[in-house]
């Protein structure tokens, strides 16, 4: 079975690969134990009254669009976003990051663009870039790989695990800026198959195609930290690779998305051009919702009033007993992350 078919990554095969790897991880220290679980958005390390969150992620094949357009500055923002948005899902405040760049050759202009992007992302997320590694590996990398790792800190009694999610809770969606940084294997195939020039206007847009595709990933850290001081958040999910399946990583319940956010034009056009159905779209892309928060019904007005002028948001659904994600408007059912 191929890992990629028609531009769509085989999530089941990917899950089997990850599971095979995780099963070998049998050793652990007796102190500084992992108090989270492997498979969450971030890992948690016991530090007494506090826990350190630690996770890593990358920008994926979005870098190939950047290379074709010779525009690399937004990739740094993307890399910061992919990491800090994962860290915040447990209530952890991201504090520091290291980057990893694997390149074919050394180009000072690309380095400046990337560094500028990382700096902008760090300012938005309020973290420090404290180190990194640049590997020149032309035999391995034909393009460029941009990734990083973030640590954060949270008081142990304030860790958000999703355990308190119950039937009747409210699901709030925070709007995305566009594609963010996942699904680009599919995106690139659609762009190629339809012979779309990156420097022409994207269908239905006044922006160039490369500008639409490279729109940087939205960072939600400051908004979530601010609202955490006011409202009890029960669970959070970063909608990245795997689309809305990420919602199931909070707790095994049924998440009914009965009023989804309106997908931006980029998703509508990619769906048409790629001849994809709604199920495929929602298990690949964020479809306009970059981050999901679960709260109690009584807290929804305070939540919305706190953030309504800072990020697009709306109540998109509710929690029921059961399993998976249901999007009745499009007759979509999603079961499990892998």
Curated annotation (Swiss-Prot):
Q: Which gene encodes it?
A: purM
The GO biological-process annotations, alphabetized, read as: 'de novo' IMP biosynthetic process; adenine biosynthetic process
Enzyme type, top EC level:
ligase
Pathway(s) annotated for this protein in UniProt: Purine metabolism; IMP biosynthesis via de novo pathway; 5-amino-1-(5-phospho-D-ribosyl)imidazole from N(2)-formyl-N(1)-(5-phospho-D-ribosyl)glycinamide: step 2/2
**Family as reported in the entry's similarity comment:** Belongs to the AIR synthase family.
- Source organism per entry reads Thermoplasma volcanium (strain ATCC 51530 / DSM 4299 / JCM 9571 / NBRC 15438 / GSS1)
Keywords, comma-separated and alphabetical: ATP-binding, Cytoplasm, Ligase, Nucleotide-binding, Purine biosynthesis
GO cellular component, alphabetical, reads: cytosol
Q: What is this protein called?
A: Phosphoribosylformylglycinamidine cyclo-ligase
Subcellular location(s) per record: Cytoplasm
* UniProt xrefs under InterPro entries: PurM-like_C_dom (IPR010918), PurM-like_C_sf (IPR036676), PurM-like_N (IPR016188), PurM-like_N_sf (IPR036921), PurM_cligase (IPR004733)
The reactions it catalyses are: 2-formamido-N(1)-(5-O-phospho-beta-D-ribosyl)acetamidine + ATP = 5-amino-1-(5-phospho-beta-D-ribosyl)imidazole + ADP + phosphate + H(+)
A molecular function (GO) held by this record is: phosphoribosylamine-glycine ligase activity
Coiled-coil spans in chain: none
EC assignment: the record states 6.3.3.1
Taking the first listed entry, what is the main subcellular location of this protein, grouped into a coarse class?
cytoplasm
């Amino acid at each position: 079975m191929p890992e990629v078919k028609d531009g769509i990554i085989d999530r089941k095969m990917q899950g089997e690969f990850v599971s095979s790897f995780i099963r070998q991880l049998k050793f652990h220290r007796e102190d500084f134990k992992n108090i989270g679980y492997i498979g969450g958005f971030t890992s948690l390390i016991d530090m007494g009254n506090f826990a350190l969150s630690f996770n890593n992620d990358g920008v994926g094949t979005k870098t190939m669009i950047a290379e074709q357009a010779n525009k690399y500055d937004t990739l740094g923002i993307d890399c910061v976003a992919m990491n800090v948005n994962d860290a915040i899902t447990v209530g952890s405040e991201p504090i520091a990051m290291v980057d990893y760049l694997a390149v074919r050759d050394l180009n000072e202009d690309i380095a400046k663009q990337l560094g500028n992007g990382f700096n902008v992302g760090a300012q938005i997320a309020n973290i420090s870039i404290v180190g990194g590694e640049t590997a020149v590996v032309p035999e391995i990398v034909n393009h460029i790989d941009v990734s990083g790792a973030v640590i954060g800190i949270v008081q142990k009694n304030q860790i958000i695990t999703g355990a308190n999610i119950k039937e009747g809770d409210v699901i709030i969606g925070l709007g995305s800026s566009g594609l963010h940084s996942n699904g680009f294997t599919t995106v690139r195939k659609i762009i190629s198959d339809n012979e779309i020039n990156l420097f022409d206007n994207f269908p239905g847009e006044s922006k160039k195609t490369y500008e639409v595709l490279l729109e940087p990933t939205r960072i939600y850290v400051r908004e979530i930290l601010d609202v955490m001081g006011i409202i009890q958040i029960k669970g959070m999910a970063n909608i990245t690779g795997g689309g809305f399946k990420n919602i199931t990583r909070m707790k095994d319940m049924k998440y009914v998305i009965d009023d989804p956010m309106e997908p931006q034009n980029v998703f509508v056009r990619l769906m048409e051009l790629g001849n994809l159905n709604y199920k495929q779209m929602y298990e690949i892309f964020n479809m306009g919702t970059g981050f999901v928060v679960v709260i109690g019904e009584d807290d929804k007005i305070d939540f919305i009033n706190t953030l309504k002028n800072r990020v697009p948001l709306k109540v998109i659904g509710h929690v029921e007993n059961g399993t998976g994600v249901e999007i009745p408007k499009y007759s979509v059912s999603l079961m499990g992350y892998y």
